[in-house]
Every structure is written in structure tokens, then in C-alpha cells.
Curated annotation (Swiss-Prot):
Family that this chain belongs to: Belongs to the sulfotransferase 2 family.
Keywords carried by this UniProt record: Carbohydrate metabolism, Glycoprotein, Golgi apparatus, Membrane, Signal-anchor, Transferase, Transmembrane, Transmembrane helix
Main location, first listed in the record: Golgi
GO cellular component, one term: Golgi membrane
Protein name (record): Carbohydrate sulfotransferase 10
Organism: Xenopus laevis
Membrane topology field: Single-pass type II membrane protein
Record field: transmembrane: 7-27
Gene Ontology terms, MF aspect: sulfotransferase activity
Compartment list: Golgi apparatus membrane
InterPro entries xref list: Carb_sulfotrans_8-10, P-loop_NTPase, Sulfotransferase
Known function: Catalyzes the transfer of sulfate to position 3 of terminal glucuronic acid of both protein- and lipid-linked oligosaccharides. Participates in biosynthesis of HNK-1 carbohydrate structure, a sulfated glucuronyl-lactosaminyl residue carried by many neural recognition molecules.
Amino acid sequence: MHHRWLLLVACFWVLFMLMVASKLITLTMKDPEGYGNKQGPLTVLPETEKIAVAETTKLQIESQPTTNSLKDESYTVLLHKERTELLRSVCSNGSLRNLSHTAISKFVLDRIFVSDKHRILFCQTPKVGNTQWKKVLIVLNGAFSSIEEIPENVVHDHEKNGLPRLSSFSAQDVHERLNSYFKFFIVRDPFERLISAFKDKFVHNPRFEPWYKHDIAPAIIRKYRKDRRESRGGLQFQDFVRYLGDPNHRFLDLQFGDHIIHWVTYVELCAPCEIDYNVIGHHETLEDDAPYILREAGIEHLVSYPTIPPGITKYNKSKVENYFSKVSKRDIRRLYTRFERDFKLFGYKEPTFLF
């Protein structure tokens, strides 16, 4: 009897030790990251709430910019800040005042297009992707619902495109808009822009602009071609450069009227030292500048800048050298003297390879 009792006690002791060991094993296998954390009650979400949480998490992940995009945005902001500081520095340089300053005349106000609905002013600088920006404003003003719907012949028809010029407003309204609206324009290497103007107006010569070939070109040839008896082949680039670099070019400018907007300086077009522009984009960096301008103007959710073909905005040094290779050094220097302000104000390097 005594031995049977001892056997029962021993069995009970073994069972007790097994239970203790099992508890210790369970505690040891718990997630170490959860150690010391109070466990909350388990909540089971309905299927609809599970989907909502999953979608929210997905959006949060997708909306987080990559490191590269953050760097790109920071660089773009810094770049535009440097451009603005350079412009203000050159404008305040007394020795360059005659080069950089111009009156806010009707000629300037005619170049600035207005979107009252979105409080935007855009100064037109031809040969720098200007047409595409006008399309953006036309859509914003509500004349067309999309850029693709705008007929090409309407873009520059200011009776039909719904783009009022700043010159159409009263002096008080002009003042208020210049002081409170978002203002921008685009620039390009000055000499490459002149080449683009020459090719577009005097080489390709669109059919709906016959006056460049039939009126303006002959007038330049008569005054600036060295051998005036040789008039075959139309206007040559050398003739064009002599006209633009002539200190007395205004005589023909008055004769040509507003057609000169395709080759006059940015200073004459937009008065950047008199008007405090928010952004000045560069044609060479338009792929980055266009989205930046839309963001700064607060319209990036309303319209997009048209797709830019690869490489089309890149500065083509060899093309510039080729066009100027037949122009005399004297004529190049005179041309640079006139456009020096555009080079300095917007940070373009002096074309030393042309001298």
C-alpha cells in the first residue's frame, strides 16, 4: 500500500514538471519584438474595411517620391532661384543699365497674354516653344477643352483664341495685374534663337506669312547685301546678321512693324528688369521647367504641357558654328553688342568660338 502511494505521488510530480516545461517553451517562442508590449484586443475588419486600408496603404507608398525625384525637385528649385538672383544682379548693375532696361511700353504689353481666371501673365518670346504655351493658356481660359482640339490657325489669331493682351486693359488694371499675377516667360540661347527665326521665316517661309519673303527679305537685301546686284537665292544669313547688328536697325524695324518680334531682344519684348517675373524658363531645360512652371502657377492639375520630342530643346553648338562660319568677325561682334544683354541677364555664355 505504501509503495502504491509513492508511485502515485511520483506520477503526479512528473505530470506537473511537464506542464511547467510546456509553459516555458511557449514563452520562449514568442516574437522578441513584442516583448514588454501590452497586447491589445484583436479586431477583425470587415472585408470592405480591409480593402480600404489596403488601398490607402498603396496610395501612401505610391505617393512617396523617390530619392532621385526629391533631388531633381530640389535642384530645379535651386536652379530657378539662381536664375532670378542673376537677373536681379544684372538689372541692378548701373554700368549695364542702358543694356538691360526698357520702358513698359505698349509694345511690351502687347506681348503679354492674360488669364484672369487663373491669375497668370505670359510674355510671348517667339522661337522658344511659345506656341505650346499659348495653347496651354487657351485651354485654361476655356476657349477649348483640350490642347488637341485647337486648330493651328487659331493659336495666333487673337480674335478667336480667347487670349486677351495686357495692353487691352486700363492703366490701373495693368498695374494691378503686374503686381499680383503669376508672371513668366521662356528664353533660349540668343544666337540659336536668331537662327531659328531665320530658318522659319525666310527659308521655310510658311504660306500664310508671305510678307517675310516678299516684303521684309527684299528690304534687308537692298540695304545690307554687299553686292546688291546679286539678289538670287533670297535672303542669306549674312544679310540678316548685318541688319540685326546695325546700330541703325530701327529704321527698318519701324517699316516691318510687329513682325520684328521674332528677332528683337528679350529685353525689348518682356522688360525683365522692370517687371518682376516669378519664373523665367529656359528652352534648353524645358522638360524640367514646364512642369515646374505649371506647379508654381498652381495649374498642374488642370493642364499639361504638350509632349516634347527627345533632343529638340538641346543647344546645338555645331549648328550655330556652321551658320556663323560665313559671317565676318566684325558683323558677329556688332550682333553680340546688341544681344549682349540677353546673354548676361539669363546666364548664357559669351560665344567665344565665334570671335
